[in-house]
Amino acid sequence: MRLNTLSPAEGAKHAPKRVGRGIGSGLGKTAGRGHKGQNSRSGGGVRRGFEGGQMPLYRRLPKFGFTSRKAMITAEVRLSELALVEGDVIDLNTLKAANVVGVQIEFAKVMLSGEIARPVTLRGLRVTKGARAAIEAAGGKIEE
């Protein structure tokens, strides 16, 4: 068996519709688009959210909220992700080096999700109560 002899099983693939190829094909002449109208034209159709000229839903509803600038530079880190980081001392730079958080991140908070078996020292990271208990139970410690 070689790569050039492989083929999908019989009946596993459907042939694509061939439209506009004569009356006998069942999809000739208008090619399944019907007669006239905007959708029969090439490039026809309306944009997403268009409701025929009626004020669309996304404009009928009021604007609300905002995007926190701090949320863009803050990351949540799971305990299971901490287990993947090499070394005993973990800080923001070691998380970035291990590709756990992106380079633009300035703050990280450790969440209780997954588990950690080895003792680690967290330096300069925020930690939830549950994650703190799990880290200390594994013999680790948290430095502010």
Swiss-Prot record:
Entry annotated with the keyword NAD = no
For this chain's UniProt record, which GO biological process terms are given? Answer: translation
Composition bias, kind Gly residues: at what positions? 21-31
Instruction: Write out the ranges of the annotated region (Disordered).
Output: 1-53
PROSITE patterns, A to Z? RIBOSOMAL_L15
What cellular-component terms does GO give this entry? cytosolic large ribosomal subunit
Known function: Binds to the 23S rRNA.
Subunit and interaction comment: Part of the 50S ribosomal subunit.
Give the family, as the similarity comment puts it. Answer: Belongs to the universal ribosomal protein uL15 family.
The protein depicted here goes by the name Large ribosomal subunit protein uL15
- The organism named in the record is Serratia proteamaculans (strain 568)
Gene from which this protein is expressed: rplO
